[in-house]
């Protein structure tokens, strides 16, 4: 996988697809059970690295998970100072690195506050500042806005844009399609441990076609309806929900609604969205 400098790349896919596992493996936090080579930023992580080279490699890569990696009783600045020491950042460079990271993440005015006193949104921005303090070329963000309200999430989006503008490459995992549309240059769709698609957000959306039909089908008719759509029209269908009484079905590739009308089905017709491609790649029948 090659990522361009300054790209923001989304890693999306169903729960259990392997997104967090992939991020933790290529960041060196986990060791794969089956691999003969794992080269990231020029270093094979399956081979022991000399201590000096290991420190240098670690400084090139940042990782911020959706769970806090911070020490609550330390101040924001003290948390970043700790990371500088841990990763061997030269003492003469620490103050500049810390100040730059806090400015990028818009937390400089809270540098003296203990982390436990901060809101969830602020903690996440400090978490990203922590990952940035070694001045990495590449940063991994694992669901960076999980659990945040829209205003706090928007603050994190501002941080990601500033990282991109400063030349940092960002790989983020997310379930939020608006994040993918608004922030990302490229999308990787992961399913069952494999990359199933690699495209821009718009190119990926186009896989769902121009129009999607959303059907409400009685559960007793589910199989016959899907069979007719697939066999007679070559449609692709995805079952979104089945409550035992009625099934919510997405139908892709229909040129018109004639057959739906003939079958007396209840449906809505709308323009395809990126989320529809997610359903198509992650749950096609």
Per-segment meaning from a language model:
Residues 139-142:
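Catalytic Walker B motif of ABC-type/P-loop ATPase nucleotide-binding domains
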Residues 157-248:
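ABC transporter nucleotide-binding domain
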Residues 81, 85, 92-110:
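Conserved ABC ATPase "signature" region
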Residues 12-14:
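The feature captures the beta-strand-to-loop junction immediately N-terminal to the Walker
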Residues 248-285:
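C-terminal coupling/interaction segments
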Residues 27:
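Helix-to-loop junction immediately C-terminal to a conserved catalytic motif
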Residues 35-48, 57:
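Conserved ABC transporter NBD signature motif
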